[in-house]
């Protein structure tokens, strides 16, 4: 089958090459999917660069989310079913396998190619904003990187859950995009201090942060008493100085998580919760995947280069069939 390999094991976007590799064979409890489209995510870039190796037993091929047609079924899935699925790897290919419990039906009337942009982002937002961050109706969420794939999904899911959203983005155009996606307040991080904006509205309850570094102390200031700071990445630096007394005084919770290394049972639990709560939001149009641009599979290198530039709003995709 056609797949994308990293020439030399690591490198820049130009290291991504089309290759012929054996088609995967599903084990017991797994399904085989004929891939129509795959999402491109930051962890794919980190893996390509050699910083984020796949967990034990996961395919070396990039790709953490796909949508397509079931070829070999298991559990509730039968050949011909249209699904989107969370993968431990292997999505940049014509065929992929996954635990049958990590696949979900295409919600509503979404096109299969758009549904491929759901699993990684929706699972991440649900686990971090709603479980670790415990965002409740009436509370306020601050989302950094608001026009990223994670950001646009976090805005929509928080609004669907009855929360307010303060979104930060770089530049006035992206700030406007965040407002159009439903954010109540948008902060241009290039010209405004988001912690000042947050304090002016009484603080925020949850911060979803993928930046780290210089944002850390500002996040502490932005949070109101009892607030929760949730990290999902540290693109701006992973080491910070912790103001312990301030954290104690404000009774803050500092947490974070990754998705890919979680066990199969934990991912199955997340999938069930996502289908129960989030899938109805998508079916009724409250939440939708925002696709910025799609590239053919063979142009995976161009897709990575585009994502790294940071000009996108929403998801970058690969079309396979």
Where are these regions (language model features)?
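Mid-domain Rossmann-like dinucleotide-binding core that forms the NAD(H)/NADP(H) cofactor-binding site
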Residues: 116-191
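Short amphipathic alpha-helix with an adjacent loop that forms part of the alpha/beta core around
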Residues: 193-202
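NAD(P)H dinucleotide-binding glycine-rich loop of Rossmann-like/cofactor-binding domains
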Residues: 46, 82-145
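Glycine-rich phosphate-binding loop and adjacent beta-alpha segment
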Residues: 214-286, 319-321
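Short glycine-centered segments of the SAM/dcSAM-binding site in methyltransferase folds
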Residues: 82, 140, 164, 227-228, ...
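Glycine-rich beta-strand-centered segment in the early N-terminal region that forms part
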Residues: 22-40, 49-90
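C-terminal hydrophobic helical "lid"/dimerization subdomain
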Residues: 1, 267-321
